């Protein structure tokens, strides 16, 4: 028996809701959607097709597991499909966000990984005109 119909939401924890809002709304351009009046702070974003991202305050958070200087695809993350990965990568570069930007050999898709202020990883994935690895730009500490 299949226990579910579809993915409903992805939830991540942050230590500062205002910084998360600045990143997800201001930098990435996510659209905030109504959130029930829970007894803890947070933000909800609509991602399309009924999927949402739930940002939850956990100010006692030790640090997420992805707190590392480098950005690697095998670290925990969620991925968002983009119809034009080249335009998305250009926009991320213009914003000056540290990222890992590669073309996957097995799939031929371009993958651009960024981190939010709490170290949670977000991947943008989609088709590209390039067939080779594009570039890797990471934080100045690892450049």
Language model regions located:
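Vicinal oxygen chelate
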Residues: 2-3, 6-15, 43-47, 66-143, ...
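N-terminal beta-strand motif that seeds the catalytic metal site of vicinal oxygen chelate
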Residues: 1-19, 75-80, 128-143
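Core segments of cupin and vicinal oxygen chelate
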Residues: 13-52
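Short, charged/polar surface micro-motifs in flexible loops or helix N-caps
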Residues: 49-53, 59-62, 84-87
């Amino acid at each position: 028996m299949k226990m579910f119909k579809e993915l409903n939401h992805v939830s991540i924890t942050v230590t500062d809701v205002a910084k998360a809002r600045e990143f997800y709304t201001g930098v990435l351009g996510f659209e905030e959607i109504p959130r029930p009046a829970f007894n803890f702070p947070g933000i909800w974003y609509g991602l399309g097709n009924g999927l949402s991202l739930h940002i939850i305050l956990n100010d006692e958070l030790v640090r997420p597991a992805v707190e590392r200087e480098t950005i690697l695809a095998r670290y925990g993350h969620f991925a968002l499909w983009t119809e034009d990965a080249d335009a998305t990568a250009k926009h991320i570069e213009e914003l000056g966000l540290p990222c890992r930007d590669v073309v996957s050999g097995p799939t031929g898709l371009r993958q651009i990984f960024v981190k939010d202020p709490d170290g949670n990883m977000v991947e943008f994935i989609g088709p590209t005109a390039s067939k080779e690895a594009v570039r890797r730009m990471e934080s100045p500490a690892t450049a």
